[in-house]
Design a protein with these regions (language model features):
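HIT superfamily nucleotide-processing domains
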Residues: 1-119
Length: 119
């Protein structure tokens, strides 16, 4: 498993920086965003360092599939209202032009009454 010693998310996963953990297993880690945009707002990341979605390969299909199945379960556990009246939003920014600020692949999972409309 690869880690970048300069990556803030790798440091959080390793326990060197405190976080409010939501979930962890051998492949995935989830923790609350420190500047939430919604009543429910956590990050879902691979434990190993992948800079962005642009670096994914066929080897990543299994954990990526697990991540997509896990996200709705965690969203509900964290307080998102059930689909279809409720729901949640997943955002994954890729690269500088895509708005990615931390160079460790991650998804923002957000829920609540349209919090992203705040601007």
């Amino acid at each position: 498993m690869t880690h970048d010693p300069n990556c803030i998310f790798c440091k959080i996963i390793a326990g060197h920086i405190p976080s409010r953990k939501v979930y962890e297993d051998d492949d995935l880690f989830a923790f609350h965003d420190i500047h939430p945009w919604a009543p429910v707002h956590f990050l879902l990341v691979p434990r190993h360092h992948v800079a962005s979605m642009a670096q994914l390969t066929a080897r990543d299909e299994v954990w990526m599939g697990r991540l997509m199945v896990l996200a709705p379960k965690l969203a509900l556990e964290q307080g998102c209202n059930p689909y279809p009246a409720g729901g949640f939003r997943m955002v994954c920014n890729t690269g500088d032009e895509g708005g990615q600020e931390v160079q460790h692949l991650h998804w923002h999972v957000m829920g609540g009454p349209r919090p992203w409309a705040r601007g």
